[in-house]
């Protein structure tokens, strides 16, 4: 097996309606790689949002390539969103199990939530990503709205009970936090809402075929096996199950296919200022496509 690291795919090449290769770049030169079958496994699109917990290269490239090649995208609006650290240690996942021990306040010191909040925070501690199914959605909505009002986000402090006698599952998290980030329970932190994993993507059949001959897909680039909510950890199972299916299906598809073309035509597109366009897109997605959406905001986006 030949591994070409540090490359980016620019286009999927088709001949007679079948995917037969890809145009890639190493940043300096363009290369055409021909193939009898191709598997997309490029991940989601979390970094299209200003705040995201995934790496910066998870930007929906695979979905865009597939759409351009003739595939159908499904459930693209379904996004896994959860709290994370704004400071210190930006992009660190906030442990939802600690919600039951927290005092949440706006930057000016005002309480984030009104009224009796203990039962709400207790419920919020039972799930990681945001869900609209439970009353605990009020916690995520309040955090998100606070971030829109003040980019510093929400200040978190922990109860004496947790600091002096933390449950084992919380202690394990803070042991990791101290070793990996140099943080303790005593440190002041600010949190906000972060985009994470995509629950939508390229439509695939059970054998991972996409409807475009020669093209298969697996993992977070795909959609359809998850709804609006996805239990944490199922992305790994998704990748293992459908990754194996994609490999088998791609091998089987190669048996009755002729050799791919030796060359291809590629029409390059120039962009004036990609970084500014991308930053503007991230801000737009953060303001209009996070946990709170409405018709006006989505239309503006």
Please provide the spans of the model-predicted regions.
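Feature captures the FAD/FMN-dependent oxidoreductase FAD-binding
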Residues: 1-26, 31-32
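General beta-strand structural signal in soluble alpha/beta enzymes
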Residues: 3-6, 40-41, 73-78, 114-115, ...
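Glycine- and aromatic-enriched mobile tails/lids
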Residues: 15-19, 105-121, 197, 203-217, ...
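Core beta-strand elements of the Rossmann-like FAD/NAD(P) dinucleotide-binding domain
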Residues: 28-37, 211-212
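Glycine-rich loop(s) and the adjacent beta-strand/alpha-helix scaffold that form part
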Residues: 37-91, 232-249
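An anion/pyrophosphate-binding glycine-rich loop and adjacent beta-alpha core
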Residues: 65, 71-183, 249-251, 255
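FAD/FMN-dependent oxidoreductases across multiple families
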Residues: 171-215
């Amino acid at each position: 097996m030949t591994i070409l690291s540090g490359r980016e795919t620019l286009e999927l090449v088709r001949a007679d309606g079948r995917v037969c290769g890809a145009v890639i770049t190493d940043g300096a030169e363009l290369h055409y790689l021909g193939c009898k079958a191709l598997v997309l496994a490029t991940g989601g699109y979390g970094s299209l949002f200003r705040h995201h917990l995934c790496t910066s290269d998870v930007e929906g490239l695979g979905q865009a390539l597939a759409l351009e090649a003739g595939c159908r995208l499904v459930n693209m609006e379904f996004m896994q969103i959860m709290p994370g650290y704004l400071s210190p240690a930006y992009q660190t996942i906030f442990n939802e199990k600690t919600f039951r021990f927290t005092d949440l306040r706006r930057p000016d010191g005002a309480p984030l939530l009104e009224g009796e909040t203990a039962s709400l925070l207790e419920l919020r501690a039972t799930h990681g990503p945001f869900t609209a199914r439970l009353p605990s959605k009020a916690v995520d909505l309040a955090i998100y709205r606070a971030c829109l009002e003040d980019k510093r986000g929400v200040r978190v402090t922990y109860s004496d009970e947790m600091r002096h006698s933390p449950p084992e599952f919380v202690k394990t998290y803070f042991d990791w936090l101290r070793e990996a980030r140099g943080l303790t329970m005593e440190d002041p932190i600010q949190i906000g809402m972060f985009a994470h994993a995509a629950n939508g993507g390229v439509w695939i059949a059970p054998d991972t075929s996409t409807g475009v001959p020669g093209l298969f897909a697996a993992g977070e680039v795909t959609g359809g096996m998850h709804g609006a909510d996805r239990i944490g950890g199922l992305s790994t199972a998704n990748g293992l199950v459908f990754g194996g299916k994609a490999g088998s299906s791609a091998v089987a598809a190669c048996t009755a296919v002729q050799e791919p073309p030796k060359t291809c035509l590629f029409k390059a597109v120039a962009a004036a200022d990609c970084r500014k366009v991308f930053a503007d897109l991230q801000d737009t997605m953060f303001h209009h496509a996070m946990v709170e959406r409405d018709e006006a905001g989505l239309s503006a986006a």
